[in-house]
């Protein structure tokens, strides 16, 4: 990435900005999303779209609803008792919350990488091969070997593990485990990759490696990342959405959000007046 043009997290002003340049057609289009935990409303009427081959960052203070919203995109909220999602989330024109949609197949199209690396208690090889096996993506051992190698290469891990594929996935370092989890998501041929604070448990060196990987993966996938780090959002994303108290306050090109926000609440958050 060209660091000379990297947006900064300080010095935001409130002068009107130009209209955001056009982006690719949305891979996912969210319309009037509302999320409830029992009687408590966590997300309020959020409409937001995510373009293909780009990184969109969701930022905001703790408890603002960004992770809850992220989980809507592959129906992970279905697994939470008393959680209810209303509104439409369209993928290829079809509402993913329709009862005809198999959530298991949906999650193969919309993969997820969690805050803490969570490799399966299996070998490095089987961590990657598990998904393609259950989804019938390989017709032979040779096909499976090819998927494993390609996924590990795309995650930047192949050269580090190619001679110990039968070692436990848990034997890897934290940063390697997170790249293994990214490779596992890639292996089932997703169209979208969701990342929920993927670097929060990693050291700076491992974080830099994951950020480089995200920049490479965006050439192939629609990526949505939740991050508590405004600096990380500025480094890795092309578009940024700012959430506060379950509301979408502002959405725009990352450079505009960080240097010329339209909303005062966005400026106050970016400049550290609250957080």
From Swiss-Prot:
InterPro entries: AAA+_ATPase, ABC_transporter-like_ATP-bd, ABC_transporter-like_CS, P-loop_NTPase, PstB-like. Gene3D superfamilies: P-loop containing nucleotide triphosphate hydrolases (3.40.50.300). It is found in: Cell inner membrane. Keywords: ATP-binding, Cell inner membrane, Cell membrane, Membrane, Nucleotide-binding, Phosphate transport, Translocase, Transport. The keyword Transport applies. One of its GO terms (biological process) is phosphate ion transmembrane transport. It comes from the Bacteria. The keyword ATP-binding applies. ATP binds at residues 60-67. It is a peripheral membrane protein. One of its GO terms (molecular function) is ATPase-coupled phosphate ion transmembrane transporter activity. One of its GO terms (cellular component) is plasma membrane. Its main location: membrane. Transmembrane segments: none annotated. Residues 28-270 form the ABC transporter domain. It is an enzyme of class 7 (translocase). Its EC number is 7.3.2.1. It catalyses: phosphate(out) + ATP + H2O = ADP + 2 phosphate(in) + H(+). It holds the Pfam family ABC_tran. NCBIfam families: 3a0107s01c2. Belongs to the ABC transporter superfamily. Phosphate importer (TC 3.A.1.7) family. Part of the ABC transporter complex PstSACB involved in phosphate import. Responsible for energy coupling to the transport system. The complex is composed of two ATP-binding proteins (PstB), two transmembrane proteins (PstC and PstA) and a solute-binding protein (PstS). This is Phosphate import ATP-binding protein PstB. It comes from Hyphomonas neptunium (strain ATCC 15444).
């Amino acid at each position: 990435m060209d660091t000379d043009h990297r947006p900064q997290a300080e010095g935001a002003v409130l002068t009107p900005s130009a209209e955001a340049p056009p982006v690719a057609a949305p891979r996912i289009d969210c319309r009037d999303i509302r999320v409830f935990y029992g009687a408590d409303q966590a997300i309020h009427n959020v409409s937001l779209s995510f373009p293909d081959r780009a990184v969109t960052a969701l930022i905001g203070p703790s408890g603002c609803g960004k992770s809850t919203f992220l989980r809507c995109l592959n129906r992970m909220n279905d697994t939470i008792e008393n959680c209810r999602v209303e509104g439409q989330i369209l993928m290829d024109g079809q509402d993913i919350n329709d009862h005809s949609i198999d959530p298991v197949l949906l999650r193969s199209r919309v993969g997820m990488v969690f805050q803490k690396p969570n490799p399966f208690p299996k070998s490095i090889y089987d961590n990657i091969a598990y998904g393609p096996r259950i989804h019938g993506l390989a017709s032979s051992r040779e096909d499976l070997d090819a998927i494993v190698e390609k996924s590990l290469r795309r995650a930047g891990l192949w050269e580090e593990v190619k001679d110990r594929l039968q070692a436990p996935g848990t034997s890897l370092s934290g940063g390697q485990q997170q790249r293994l989890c990214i490779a596992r998501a890639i292996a089932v041929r997703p169209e979208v990759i969701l990342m929920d604070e993927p670097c929060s448990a990693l050291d700076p060196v491992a974080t830099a490696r994951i950020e480089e990987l995200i920049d490479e993966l965006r050439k192939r996938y629609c990526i949505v990342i939740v991050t508590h780090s405004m600096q990380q959002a500025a480094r890795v994303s092309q578009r940024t959405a700012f959430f506060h108290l379950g509301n979408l306050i502002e959405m725009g090109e990352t450079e505009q959000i960080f240097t010329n926000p339209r909303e005062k609440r966005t400026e106050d958050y970016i400049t550290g007046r609250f957080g």
